[in-house]
């Protein structure tokens, strides 16, 4: 035992020092243990040869621990070597820079050879070198912070609240300005421009947006241009390619009150009607300064045009702007209609006494108010025009249509029995009473819930059929309807076969005698010829059914537990099959001994 503890001491108590782990030869110990495993023969020899699984587990765990410590030690050595090399090179470069600065030699004049630098293993450089500053060290580089492009400037919260995006539950998901496509300007070539860059999307490619500025470029550049603080967005849909009239030259700029009164630059006339519908978006001075300087010019305020000239006929086929705000239209009050009391009767109310005046039938009133039979075009009169009346109408039509179909089926059955009688559809309508005003043939409309297959079946039935044709038709109909039960029939057949197999077994088990382990133990003891004589178990249960053999086996185990019998078998794994033998030790049963048992203290003297 002491040899084993000394041998695996590093496994029981792991070595904390990384350098001492190199003294452990993991490969040699694993090889020795592998040889021991090869020599061990696992067999059924009553436990003489055993395998120590705890020792194997500790060996594997300890070997992995020692190997990981070796890897960790190598990792730390690599870090130390890299830090030493990089620190030495950094010190050499710093000293050379200071010498060049003291001598006044320009470092950029002589090309230096590019030296190999080691790749840093850390993502974050060591910040301790930037703590100590030297007095004679002056910053040689000036960090220039690049200006963020205007297209990437995040909009303000107030701008986001103007056009929010709601979900079905009413939650605010995002804003229109959160998506780049909504704020980009489409180019005539099909590209989305983050910034216009002097090109108006209303003009084709290669055309200058302001023709007048090309003539007087010198004067235009000399004059100061004002850029609007608020810029209207260009519509994303429905661009017109017709160039509008542009000013012939640069407009004279007004000052004083005109500059204070006008805070936005207007677009040319070609884009003014479409851009006027867009809400104006507020821009910061930084954003407005980044816009191109020749994009828009301030126009002179002209005389207002009359309303008749400005108003144009709207084009019904014009593409709409998905981000445009809809015009508010005045509310038009509809004309109310009262529903007759006999049309819709509420359930659950008390019965009221019928009035003396007989109200008109709803179907007749609806046809008189809704359809015009005299006119061939059947124009609608001033009648109900809302969905509730449609629902009531089609409900009434469905009821009459179902009644009509029942009468048709009854007539068809009577025609089969009495072929001499031939009635038409108009005769069946007389049985409905007031159903003469139902619908004319050209006005018949199949309701939504009607099944066209039923109507097809009624049309397919001839007026008179012979007996053979009728029988053949019924047989074909029965075969067609029984196709859907084929799968259920196969499943029921399998269930019936299973029940036929299981039911006899269940009935046989119900007929068996209830199992009593003491009763079967008494029967097994009575079969022994005498005491202390070995008798095979197969002879004791010879000629009995399988379930009786199982019960006798359980009873013999209980007898062996009570030391009434002794059980033995032949040695060997395969040779011991069906070699069970029993020997009766005593005829006295254990449960009977406990029933008649009396403690010595309770015995009478």
Swiss-Prot record:
Modified-residue entries (Phosphothreonine), positions: 19
Keywords, ordered alphabetically: Chromosome, DNA condensation, Nucleus, Phosphoprotein
InterPro entries linked: CNDH2_C (IPR031737), H2_M (IPR031719), H2_N (IPR009378), Ncaph2 (IPR031739)
Region of interest: Disordered: 194-331
GO molecular function, one term: chromatin binding
Name of one Pfam family that matches: CNDH2_C
GO-annotated cellular components: cell junction; condensed nuclear chromosome; condensin complex; intercellular bridge; membrane; nucleoplasm; nucleus
Composition bias type Acidic residues, residue spans: 256-266
Primary subcellular site in the record, as a coarse category: nucleus
Modified residue annotations for Phosphoserine: 95, 200, 208, 228, 232, 282, 284, 466, 492
Superkingdom of this protein's organism: Eukaryota
Cellular compartments annotated: Nucleus; Chromosome
GO BP, one annotated term: positive regulation of chromosome segregation
Subunit structure of this chain's protein: Component of the condensin-2 complex, which contains the SMC2 and SMC4 heterodimer, and three non SMC subunits, NCAPG2, NCAPH2 and NCAPD3 that probably regulate the complex.
Family: Belongs to the CND2 H2 (condensin-2 subunit 2) family.
Function field: Regulatory subunit of the condensin-2 complex, a complex that seems to provide chromosomes with an additional level of organization and rigidity and in establishing mitotic chromosome architecture. May promote the resolution of double-strand DNA catenanes (intertwines) between sister chromatids. Condensin-mediated compaction likely increases tension in catenated sister chromatids, providing directionality for type II topoisomerase-mediated strand exchanges toward chromatid decatenation. Required for decatenation of chromatin bridges at anaphase.
Protein name: Condensin-2 complex subunit H2
């Amino acid at each position: 035992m002491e040899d084993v503890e000394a041998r695996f001491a590093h496994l029981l108590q792991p070595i904390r020092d990384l350098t001492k782990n190199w003294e452990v030869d993991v490969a040699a110990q694993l090889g020795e243990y592998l040889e021991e495993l090869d020599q061990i023969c696992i067999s059924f020899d009553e436990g003489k040869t055993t395998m120590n699984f705890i020792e194997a587990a500790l060996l594997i765990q300890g070997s992995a621990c020692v190997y990981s410590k070796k890897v960790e030690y190598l990792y730390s050595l690599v870090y130390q070597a890299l830090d030493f090399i990089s620190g030495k090179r950094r010190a050499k470069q710093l000293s050379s820079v200071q010498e060049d600065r003291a001598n006044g030699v320009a470092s950029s004049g002589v090309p230096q050879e590019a030296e190999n630098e080691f790749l840093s293993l850390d993502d974050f450089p060591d910040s301790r070198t930037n703590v100590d500053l030297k007095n004679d060290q002056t910053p040689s580089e000036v960090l220039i912070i690049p200006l963020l492009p205007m297209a990437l400037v995040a909009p303000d919260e107030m701008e986001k609240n103007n056009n929010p995006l709601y979900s079905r539950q009413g939650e605010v998901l995002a804003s229109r300005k959160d998506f780049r496509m909504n704020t980009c300007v489409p180019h005539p070539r099909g590209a989305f421009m983050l910034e216009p860059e002097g090109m108006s999307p209303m003009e084709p490619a290669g055309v200058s947006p302001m023709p007048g500025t090309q003539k007087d470029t010198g004067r235009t550049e000399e004059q100061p241009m004002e850029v609007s603080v608020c810029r209207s967005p260009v519509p994303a849909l429905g661009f017109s390619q017709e160039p509008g009239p542009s000013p012939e030259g640069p407009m004279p700029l007004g000052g004083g009150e005109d500059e204070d009164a006008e805070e936005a630059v207007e677009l040319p006339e070609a884009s003014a009607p479409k851009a006027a519908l867009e809400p104006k978006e507020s821009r910061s001075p930084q954003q407005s300064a980044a816009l191109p300087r020749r994009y828009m010019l301030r126009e002179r305020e002209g005389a207002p045009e009359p309303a008749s000239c400005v108003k144009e006929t709207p084009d019904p086929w014009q593409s709409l702007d998905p981000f445009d705000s809809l015009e508010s239209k005045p509310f038009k009050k509809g004309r109310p209609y009262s529903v007759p009391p006999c049309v819709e009767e509420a359930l659950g109310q008390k019965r009221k006494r019928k009035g003396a005046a007989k109200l008109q039938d709803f179907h007749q009133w609806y046809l008189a108010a809704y359809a015009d039979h005299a006119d061939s075009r059947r124009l609608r009169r001033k009648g109900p025009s809302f969905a509730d009346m449609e629902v009531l109408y089609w409900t009434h039509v469905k009821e009459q249509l179902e009644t009509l179909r029942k009468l048709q089926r009854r007539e068809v059955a009577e025609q089969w029995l009495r072929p001499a009688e031939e009635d038409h559809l108009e005769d069946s309508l007389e049985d409905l009473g007031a159903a003469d005003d139902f619908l004319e043939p050209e006005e018949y409309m199949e309701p939504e819930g009607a099944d066209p297959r039923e109507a097809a079946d009624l049309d397919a039935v001839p007026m008179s059929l012979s007996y053979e044709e009728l029988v053949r038709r019924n047989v074909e109909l029965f075969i067609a309807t029984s196709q859907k039960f084929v799968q259920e029939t196969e499943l029921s057949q399998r269930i019936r076969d299973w029940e036929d197999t299981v039911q006899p077994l269940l009935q046989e088990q119900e007929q068996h005698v209830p199992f009593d382990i003491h009763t079967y133990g008494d029967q097994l003891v009575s079969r022994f010829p005498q005491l202390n004589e070995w008798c095979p178990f197969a002879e004791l249960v010879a000629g009995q059914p399988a379930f009786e053999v199982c019960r006798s086996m359980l009873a013999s185990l209980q007898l062996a537990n009570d030391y009434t019998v002794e059980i033995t078998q032949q040695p060997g794994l395969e040779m011991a099959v069906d070699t069970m033998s029993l020997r009766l030790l005593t005829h006295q049963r254990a449960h009977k001994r406990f029933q008649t048992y009396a403690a010595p203290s309770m015995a009478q003297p």
